UniProtKB/Swiss-Prot annotation:
The gene is POLD2. It is found in: Nucleus. Belongs to the DNA polymerase delta/II small subunit family. It comes from Oryza sativa subsp. japonica (Rice). This is DNA polymerase delta small subunit. Pfam families: DNA_pol_D_N (PF18018), DNA_pol_E_B (PF04042).
Length: 429
C-alpha cells in the first residue's frame, strides 16, 4: 500500500519554555502583556465601531458621560473554590456545589486596567464571560460608581492566511483519551483503529481510503496511572513497574502506527508531563520503540502545525473544560468559538488554569486564525464550520474520549470535511 505524503511544519516554538528563566516572578506580567496586546487591537477597531465616543481609562470615568473603556474582565464568583476555604473553620457554611460548574446567580463582572477597576452592570451577561478576557465596553458610570454597559466589542476572529487549494483527498486522524491502564481501556478497540489506519483491515476501498491518511494526532490523556501511586509516599519497587506498564503498552501500539505513517503525540492532564500550560512534549525516552522512527513527533499542548499549508491549532481539552466550569454555553463548540473571538486559547489561565509565569509574552494569544481548531478529551464528537466576517473559515472539532466512545475523527485536507471512525468490540445481539 503506497501512502500519500503531506508537507509538515511544526509551529510549537512559541510554547517552548526551555529558554525561560524562572526567578520567582508572579503572574502580573502575563496579564499586563495580554492587556497591552489586546488593547492595541481593540483601539484599532473602535473607530469603525463607535467613532463618536471617547476612549478613557477606569480612573477617567465621569458620571453619566458616555464613553468606551478597555480592560481585563475579572469574574467575582460566590462558589469559586478558594484555598482559604480548605482551612476555614466555617467550611460547612459554604454551600456544596457540583464539581463540574461553579456558577451562581449572584456572580458579577469587574473590568480592570492599570488605573483601577469598576463593577459592571447592564447589558453584559456574567454567564458568558470568564476572568482574563480583554474587551471594550460602551457605557457610562452610574451614581453608585458602577459602569452601566450598553454595548460590547470583542476582538473577533483574527485574520487568516488563504486556505490552499488541494486537489486530492488527504486525511488527518485525531484521537484522544485512550486512557491506557484504566478500567475503561479496551486494547482490542484501539488495535482495530491501528489496523484500519495502517491498512491491515477492511476491503480494497477502505484500504484505499487508509492510504490517504497522511498523519495521526493523539490529543492527550493517552495513559492512566492510578492516583494511589502518588500519595506523597515513596513508590515501592514492585509498584514502579506497574506505573510504567501503561506507557510501555502505549509505546508498543504507537510503534505500529509510526512504522506506517507520521504521528504527533500531545500530552494531556493525565499524562506524565508538567501540569501547567503550555505542557511540554513528553520525553522521547518514554517511547523506546516509537522514538526510533523519524515519523514520531512528541509535541506540546497547545499544538500548532501546518500540513500542506493548512494551519492547525489544538489542545488536549483543559482550556475548554475550564471554561465549562466557570461560564455557560449551549455546547462545547460555543466555548471553542469564544476562544477564537476573544483571540485567546486559555483566558482563564493563570486564574483558574495553571500556566507558566511568562514575563514578556502571552503564548496563548491567537494572532492568526487557523483553518482547523481541535480540542481533545470531550464528552462527545461535535464539529462546525465557523465563518468569520472577513471570510475566514475554521473547522472546529471536539474529539471524544476514545476509551468511552471508540470514536476517532478523520478530517479531509481538501475540503475540511469531517467524518468519524467508530470501533466497537461488543458482541451483544
Amino acid at each position: 500500500m503506497e501512502r500519500k505524503q503531506a508537507e509538515y511544519s511544526n509551529l510549537d516554538e512559541r510554547y517552548a519554555i526551555q529558554g525561560e528563566k524562572y526567578q520567582g516572578q508572579q503572574y502580573s506580567h502575563i496579564y499586563f502583556t495580554r492587556l497591552h496586546h489586546m488593547r492595541n487591537l481593540l483601539h484599532a477597531l473602535v473607530p469603525s465601531w463607535k467613532p463618536h465616543l471617547p476612549v478613557t481609562t477606569v480612573l477617567g470615568l465621569e458620571e453619566g458621560k458616555d464613553c468606551i473603556i478597555v480592560g481585563t474582565l475579572y469574574k467575582h464568583m460566590k462558589l469559586k473554590p478558594s484555598i482559604l476555604d480548605e482551612y476555614s473553620k466555617e467550611r460547612s457554611a459554604i454551600p456544596l456545589v457540583k464539581p463540574h460548574n461553579f456558577m451562581h446567580p449572584d456572580d458579577h463582572l469587574i473590568l480592570e486596567d492599570e488605573s483601577g477597576r469598576v463593577t459592571l452592570a447592564g447589558a453584559i451577561p456574567p454567564a458568558a464571560y470568564v476572568t482574563g478576557v480583554v474587551i471594550a465596553l460602551h457605557g457610562k458610570e452610574t451614581s453608585a460608581g458602577n459602569f452601566l454597559v450598553e454595548d460590547i466589542l470583542e476582538a473577533g476572529i483574527p485574520p487568516q492566511i488563504t486556505l490552499p487549494s488541494i486537489n486530492e483527498d488527504k486525511y488527518v486522524v485525531f484521537v484522544s483519551g485512550l486512557s491506557i491502564g484504566s478500567e475503561k481501556f479496551n486494547p482490542l478497540q484501539f488495535q482495530l483503529l491501528i489496523d484500519h489506519i495502517t491498512g491491515h483491515l477492511g476491503d480494497e476501498n477502505e484500504q484505499s481510503i487508509a492510504s490517504n491518511i497522511v498523519r495521526v494526532v493523539v490529543a492527550g490523556n493517552s495513559v492512566h496511572i492510578s492516583p494511589r501511586f502518588f500519595n506523597g509516599q515513596a513508590v515501592a519497587s514492585k509498584d514502579q513497574s506497574r506505573i510504567a506498564e501503561p506507557i510501555k503498552e502505549l509505546d508498543i501500539m504507537l510503534t505500529q502506527l509510526v512504522a506506517s505513517l507520521p504521528v504527533d503525540m500531545m500530552p494531556g492532564s493525565n499524562d506524565p508531563a508538567n501540569f501547567s500550560l503550555p505542557q511540554q512534549p513528553l520525553h522521547r525516552c518514554l517511547f523506546a520503540g516509537a522514538a526510533t522512527y523519524n515519523t514520531f513527533s512528541s509535541c506540546s499542548n497547545p499544538h500548532q502545525f501546518e500540513l500542506d499549508s493548512v494551519r492547525f491549532i489544538g489542545t488536549s481539552g483543559q482550556n475548554i473544560d475550564d471554561l465549562y466550569k466557570y461560564s455557560d454555553a449551549k455546547d462545547k463548540l460555543e466555548f471553542v468559538e469564544r476562544t477564537l473571538r476573544w483571540r485567546h486559547l486559555a483566558p482563564t489561565a493563570p486564574n483558574s488554569l495553571g500556566c507558566y509565569p511568562y514575563t514578556d509574552k502571552d503564548p496563548f494569544l491567537v494572532e492568526s486564525c487557523p483553518h482547523v481548531y481541535f480540542v481533545g478529551n470531550q464528552d462527545k464528537y461535535e464539529t462546525q464550520l465557523l465563518q468569520g466576517l472577513e471570510k475566514q473559515k475554521v473547522r472546529l472539532i471536539c474529539i471524544p474520549r476514545f476509551c468511552d466512545s471508540g470514536v476517532a475523527v478523520m478530517l479531509n485536507l481538501r475540503n475540511l470535511e469531517c467524518s468519524t471512525l467508530s470501533f466497537s468490540t461488543s458482541f451483544d445481539a
